[in-house]
């Protein structure tokens, strides 16, 4: 971790270092903004750097021809009808489950012959039951998922051949298929037992956590490409903000003391740096939020209730170096995106020294991170555009699935063999879903 190596820097020296970094970053703003313009609708130019080694090759892989996916035609109550009832689902950070379904329906990897399929996909929208405030209610999600699996296992023979081992589901909620927004409750619930053998495509990723199943594919949350395009600023705009963050520091409704929410990391950010002139941090979310990220050198990406957030996507797209404060986080497409090279990792316990850590990074290292971030392929991999584009997040998911092939013989059940307990889990999850 970067934070483990930096000592405390006097305030005057830190400020001077920040000024030098901001000045040095002015020339590289052109590359980052221009690359963002290409990704969301313009033409790129400027100073970029290709990802070296195998990661760069993986990022640019083409999954077409490497796998075939059969898309289950589930009743609309599991997907399309839910969106029709509440279209807000199309714009929230969990919308990857909707757009992945739409993408696969017209994708070249789709097969209409299930006997030819390498993978089976069940489109179940588990995060589209929203409150009046637009927040998802995951408490019915286990019943909904269970109902969908019961339906497809009765109508088609393919689930029963493997107990779901050649199936994948998109579960983009805070803690994935644990289906709860609070970590303690998510751990208590655990992953839905019926998904024990399936591959989970989820935004949540944390090492050695009960809500991250081995073999899962960690993806970025949804951030609307069209909205970001509408807020692009001139590519020669200087990066005059050293550190930027907008968001909650305390969740007073659920955690008034600030010790549990974000494991206290956000509270520590506020208490230590609310008056630091190098830090532009606030709970207010201005209309110029996207523009401000494009004017910033570092964008803070601390954990909240879960370790991930759309800030990570926004930072990469806008060329702002992500400062990742979430211990043991598993980042999206980590086999394709060199997060150590483009970001800065800070241990949660080192947040009080964040000013020293960031001002101690050599300018040459910062400029290289910016050149890597300016690579259009890097940005494209974080987005779910409509229509899909080469090397985008849809294609990175397919690449991840393709790399799991061929399935070992052990996934196919022998006569009489079963792995799943259909009555396991909390009693409330066994109630019928309507």
Swiss-Prot record:
Residues linked to a glycan: 160, 421
GO MF, one example: glycosyltransferase activity
Superkingdom in the source lineage: Eukaryota
Cell location: Golgi apparatus membrane
InterPro entries: Exostosin (IPR004263), Exostosin_GT47 (IPR040911)
Example GO BP: plant-type secondary cell wall biogenesis
Cytoplasmic topological segments: 1-10
Disulfide bonds: none
Protein's organism: Oryza sativa subsp. japonica
UniProt keyword list: Cell wall biogenesis/degradation, Glycoprotein, Glycosyltransferase, Golgi apparatus, Membrane, Signal-anchor, Transferase, Transmembrane, Transmembrane helix
Upper classification of the organism: Eukaryota, Viridiplantae, Streptophyta, Embryophyta, Tracheophyta
Protein name: Probable glucuronosyltransferase Os02g0520750
Family: Belongs to the glycosyltransferase 47 family.
Keyword Glycoprotein: yes
């Amino acid at each position: 971790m970067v934070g483990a190596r930096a000592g405390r820097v006097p305030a005057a020296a830190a400020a001077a270092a920040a000024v030098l970094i901001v000045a040095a970053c002015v020339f590289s703003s052109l590359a980052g903004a221009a690359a963002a313009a290409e990704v969301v609708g313009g033409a790129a130019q400027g100073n970029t750097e290709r990802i070296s080694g195998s990661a760069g090759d993986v990022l640019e892989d083409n999954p077409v021809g490497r796998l075939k996916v059969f898309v289950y035609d589930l009743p609309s109550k599991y997907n399309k009808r839910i969106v029709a009832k509440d279209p807000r689902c199309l714009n929230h950070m969990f919308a990857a489950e909707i757009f992945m379904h739409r993408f696969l329906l017209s994708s070249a990897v789709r097969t209409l012959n299930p006997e030819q399929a390498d993978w089976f996909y069940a489109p179940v929208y588990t995060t589209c039951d929203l409150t009046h405030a637009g927040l998802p209610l995951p408490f019915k999600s286990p019943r909904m998922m269970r109902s969908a699996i019961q339906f497809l296992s009765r109508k088609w023979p393919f689930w029963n051949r493997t107990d779901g081992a050649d199936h994948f589901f998109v579960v983009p909620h805070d803690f994935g298929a644990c289906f709860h927004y609070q970590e303690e409750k998510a751990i208590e619930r655990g992953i839905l037992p019926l998904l024990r053998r399936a591959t989970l495509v989820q935004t949540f990723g944390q090492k050695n956590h009960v809500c991250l199943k081995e073999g899962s594919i960690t993806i970025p949350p949804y951030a609307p490409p069209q909205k970001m395009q509408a807020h692009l600023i001139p590519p020669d705009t200087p990066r005059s903000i050293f550190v930027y963050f907008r968001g909650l520091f305390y969740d007073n409704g659920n955690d008034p003391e600030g010790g549990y929410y974000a494991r206290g990391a956000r509270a520590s950010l506020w208490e230590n740096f609310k008056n630091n002139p190098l830090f532009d941090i606030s709970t207010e979310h201005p209309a110029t939020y996207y523009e401000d990220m494009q004017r910033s050198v570092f964008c803070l990406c601390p954990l909240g209730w879960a370790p991930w957030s759309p800030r990570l996507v926004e930072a990469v797209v806008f060329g702002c170096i992500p400062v990742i404060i979430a211990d043991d986080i598993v980042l999206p497409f980590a086999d394709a995106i060199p997060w150590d090279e483009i970001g800065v990792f800070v241990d949660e316990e080192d947040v009080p020294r964040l000013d020293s850590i960031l001002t101690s990074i050599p300018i040459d290292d910062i400029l290289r991170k910016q050149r890597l971030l300016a690579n259009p392929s890097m940005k494209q991999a974080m987005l779910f555009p409509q229509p899909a584009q080469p090397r985008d997040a849809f294609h990175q998911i397919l690449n991840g699935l393709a790399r799991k092939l061929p399935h070992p013989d052990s996934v196919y059940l022998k006569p009489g063999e079963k792995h799943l307990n259909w009555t396991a889990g909390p009693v409330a999850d066994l109630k019928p879903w309507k």
